[in-house]
Design a protein with these regions (language model features):
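Short, well-structured hydrophobic secondary-structure segments
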Residues: 39-74
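Conserved NAD+-utilizing ADP-ribose enzyme module
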Residues: 2-5, 13-38, 60-62, 71-162
Length: 162
């Protein structure tokens, strides 16, 4: 199988059920969050293009988002998912072939999205530069998450701890 990476993904429980039923989870344009204008859609399309350029085949689908570098926390989920946690989400812990994992800097990605929204007026640093998966949290995009890779699924609390 080659080199593997340990990753975590936050997914709605409906997508976890899809993963269990179909044996894999792939990105779908219908699951890309909506935004004012088309900023998020353009960002996801740019990520798909960057993945293809890096040799990660996407078949034209948006990525499955994951995290590497260190285990994720409930606080990470609250920060990244926000209010929709109340509708039922889980953390999927899995390993994936390194060749299918495109890791990039999340801060630079957010700067890029902010520019797509036109809120910064600043040209962001290159966000699509491959980033090593070390000990710091890094975003990882994959074309697929296979059920065979899953180590554990942890349901997330539906509200913030008191």
């Amino acid at each position: 199988m080659g080199a593997i990476v340990e990753l975590w993904s936050f997914q709605p429980l409906t997508r976890v059920a899809e993963l269990e039923a179909r044996g894999e989870l792939v990105g779908s344009w219908e699951h890309v969050p909506s935004s004012t204008g088309d900023a998020i859609d353009r960002g996801y399309r740019a990520m798909t293009t960057a993945m293809e350029r890096a040799g990660v085949p996407t078949n034209g689908r948006p990525p499955v988002w994951a995290w590497g570098g260190r285990p994720v926390t409930v606080a990470d989920a609250e920060s990244l998912v926000g209010e929709s946690l109340r509708h039922g989400w889980a953390t999927i812990e899995f390993t994936a072939p390194a060749a299918l994992a495109m890791a990039t800097d999340y801060g630079a990605w957010n700067d890029y999205l902010a520019e797509l929204f036109g809120t910064t007026g600043v040209v962001p640093a290159a966000w699509d530069v491959p980033t090593p998966i070390g000990r710091e949290l890094v975003q990882v995009c994959l074309p697929v998450l296979r059920a065979a890779w899953v180590r554990q699924v942890h349901p997330l609390p539906r509200s913030a701890p008191a």
